[in-house]
């Protein structure tokens, strides 16, 4: 998508969801601000680096990159480690960017809400360290604000990282309690069965991706996704409103 943001600059912003190597230079022609989001695919790291290499080549100096929280901590999770490699490239090559680092998306619950209601369990193995899940709508709004901030600035702005988290840090039992309240009957958290989790995922995704997700879940349990002090306040200041809560999201998708 291309759009004009500011009459003074008459510039264009490129939203890039997938990368076609042969058309990168054409796609980036005349673009001043880039939003880079790469799918979880086997060559995600290569795609991201090539996109940024071409962006640097054509002179794009305003970038917003969607990474992931704790990319530097979850070193054995492929789609986390790849994103951290991209972050390192951005920093060491001196690119002017906002790196957004979202936690686990609340929106993933869409895929398991029927299982929760049907079997009376919360099946995601998220453990008891705590996960600060965030609504994708909040991610999108913050990303848009950062794109506009960079696009309309007088010059390229320095590198910054923003953790994107929800207002509550919830454990597996906490989430089960939320669903119990929303559904009006008991929902339990059965604990972690990583082998079973991987096997279930292999029914609808490639085996390499299922293992990637299993290893991620194992790190949920050992490390959690806990925000840093001040993260929630920073986001609510940016948005000018409270972050969306997990309970409200669960109630919404139940209908």
Residue ranges of predicted features:
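Oxidoreductase cofactor-interface core, primarily capturing Rossmann-like NAD(P)-dependent enzymes
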Residues: 1, 29-31, 40-42, 49, ...
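Residues lining the SAM
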Residues: 37, 66, 240
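Structural motif corresponding to alpha-helix initiation and N-cap regions
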Residues: 18-21, 45, 49, 194
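Conserved Rossmann-fold cofactor-binding substructure of NAD(P)-dependent oxidoreductases
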Residues: 7-32
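A hydrophobic C-terminal alpha-helical subdomain
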Residues: 155-157, 195-255
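NAD(P)-binding Rossmann-fold cofactor-contacting core
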Residues: 1-7
């Amino acid at each position: 998508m291309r759009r004009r943001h500011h009459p003074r600059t008459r510039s264009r912003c490129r939203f890039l969801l997938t990368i076609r190597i042969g058309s990168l230079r054409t796609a980036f022609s005349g673009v001043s601000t880039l939003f880079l989001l790469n799918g979880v695919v086997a060559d995600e790291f290569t795609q991201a680096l090539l996109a940024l290499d071409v962006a640097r080549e054509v002179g794009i100096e305003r970038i917003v990159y969607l990474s992931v929280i704790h990319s530097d901590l979850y070193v054995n999770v492929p789609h986390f480690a790849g994103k951290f490699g991209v972050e390192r490239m951005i920093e060491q090559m001196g690119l002017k960017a906002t790196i957004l680092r979202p936690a686990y998306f609340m929106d993933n619950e869409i895929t398991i809400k029927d299982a929760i209601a049907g079997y009376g369990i919360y099946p995601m193995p998220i453990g008891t360290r705590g996960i600060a899940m965030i609504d994708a709508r909040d991610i999108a709004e913050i990303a848009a604000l950062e794109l506009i901030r960079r696009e309309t600035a007088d010059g390229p702005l320095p590198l910054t990282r923003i953790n994107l988290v929800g207002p509550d840090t919830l454990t597996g039992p906490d989430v089960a309690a939320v669903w119990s309240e929303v559904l009006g009957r008991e929902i339990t958290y059965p604990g972690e069965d990583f082998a079973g989790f991987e096997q279930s995922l292999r029914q609808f995704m490639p085996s390499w991706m299922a293992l990637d997700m299993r290893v991620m879940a194992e790190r949920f349990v050992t490390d959690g996704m806990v925000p840093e002090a001040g993260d929630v306040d920073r986001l609510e200041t940016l948005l000018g409103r409270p972050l969306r809560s997990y309970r409200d999201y669960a109630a919404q998708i139940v209908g």
